[in-house]
Amino acid sequence: MSQAPEARPSPPSVYHERQRLELCAVHALNNVLQEQLFSQEAADEICKRLAPDSRLNPHRSLLGTGNYDVNVIMAALQGLGLAAVWWDRRRPLSQLALPQVLGLILNLPSPVSLGLLSLPLRRRHWVALRQVDGIYYNLDSKLRAPEALGDEDGVRTFLAAALAQGLCEVLLVVTKEVEEAGCWLNTS
């Protein structure tokens, strides 16, 4: 009598949007929230609310292709009852209370190239990190697929490398309660 093959758990379903135009802020929001909640139109509406009387909106690209700033990300999260907390790079990453954090959004320098030619320009790129079923993932919209970072040590290693390169900013996506209690920070 043969035994049935051992059932293997299926890999977790990880939501991951790929890069389109300069919409990395929209992709980072949706990736960190693990569903499509925001669109370019929704981000543009937030821009209009942030600068209602501005002819040239300072929160997005002049070309209308995205390139949203941190104010748009923070307002989008606030609209969902969430908060973005700036991580102070001077703090040791061991003080980051990851179980209290829904996800992370990083703002990284991104090289500009024209084919094989690298241009001496610096752009910024928004990247989401999120835990799904106990595994942290790099959900960079420029990646073909989510990149598993592993457990808390893996995400701390990734963050340390990103911060060591300089010009990296880290936002912690947390609930309002976690923000108000300050329990995203482990000081013990």
From Swiss-Prot:
InterPro entries: JOSD1/2 (IPR040053), Josephin (IPR006155). Its EC number is 3.4.19.12. GO terms for cellular component: cytoplasm; cytosol. The keyword Cytoplasm applies. Its main location: cytoplasm. GO terms for biological process: protein deubiquitination; proteolysis. Keywords: Cytoplasm, Hydrolase, Protease, Ubl conjugation pathway. It is found in: Cytoplasm, Cytosol. It comes from the Eukaryota. It catalyses: Thiol-dependent hydrolysis of ester, thioester, amide, peptide and isopeptide bonds formed by the C-terminal Gly of ubiquitin (a 76-residue protein attached to proteins as an intracellular targeting signal). GO terms for molecular function: cysteine-type deubiquitinase activity; deubiquitinase activity. Residues 11-188 form the Josephin domain. The active site is at residues 24, 125. Cleaves 'Lys-63'-linked poly-ubiquitin chains, and with lesser efficiency 'Lys-48'-linked poly-ubiquitin chains (in vitro). May act as a deubiquitinating enzyme. This is Josephin-2. It comes from Mus musculus.
